[in-house]
Amino acid sequence: MSWRSESIWIEFIVGSRKTSNFCWAFILFFGSLGFLLVGTSSYLGRNLISLFPSQQIVFFPQGIVMSFYGIAGLFISSYLWCTIFWNVGSGYDRFDRKEGIVCIFRWGFPGKNRRIFLRFLMKDIQSIRIEVKEGIYARRVLYMEIRGQGAVPLTRTDENLTPREIEQKAAELAYFLRVPIEVF
């Protein structure tokens, strides 16, 4: 999603609140909870889940392994839920032609660097760069090349844009910023 006028272009970034992250967090939470309950019921010798009789699963080694997988899954699930709650990676890119400033803002993990704010002068932008890696896991990433500071990514690596979409986005941005496009 983006907003545009003659002199300002604001590109909003989604971050970790994507449908796929919600699905993985739910699947991981309930799957690991099931593993932990089966491991615990094999230890107690009572049926905590009616699907599996506890006599069929011996605590050593199956119950211990299932309990370990359940605990590990709950930790990973809680990490996913925290990134969704904190909305890590979301933010915006603001290109202001009138003031000659580019601002890039992202939310990070809580702590000292929770707010990531980068500010550049438009005259320091050398080019808009498209990096393409073909293969089974094709990857197309849009970068902004800054004089003296290297390349700043403008799209996520997991954002699966088609070649036409990435070219369109790069062309519009390069036209707006009045800089050339490079393809690698």
From Swiss-Prot:
According to its UniProt entry, one GO biological process term is: photosynthesis
Q: What are its GO cellular component terms?
A: chloroplast thylakoid membrane; photosystem I
How is it placed in the membrane, per its record? Multi-pass membrane protein
> Please, which domain of life does this record's source organism belong to?
Eukaryota
One Pfam family matching this protein = Ycf4
Transmembrane ranges, per UniProt, are 22-42, 57-77
The entry's localization annotation reads: Plastid, Chloroplast thylakoid membrane
Q: Which UniProt keywords apply?
A: Chloroplast, Membrane, Photosynthesis, Plastid, Thylakoid, Transmembrane, Transmembrane helix
Its job: Seems to be required for the assembly of the photosystem I complex.
Family under the similarity heading = Belongs to the Ycf4 family.
Q: Which PANTHER family match?
A: PHOTOSYSTEM I ASSEMBLY PROTEIN YCF4, PTHR33288
Q: What is this protein called?
A: Photosystem I assembly protein Ycf4
This protein's species is: Gossypium hirsutum (Upland cotton)
Q: Which gene encodes it?
A: ycf4
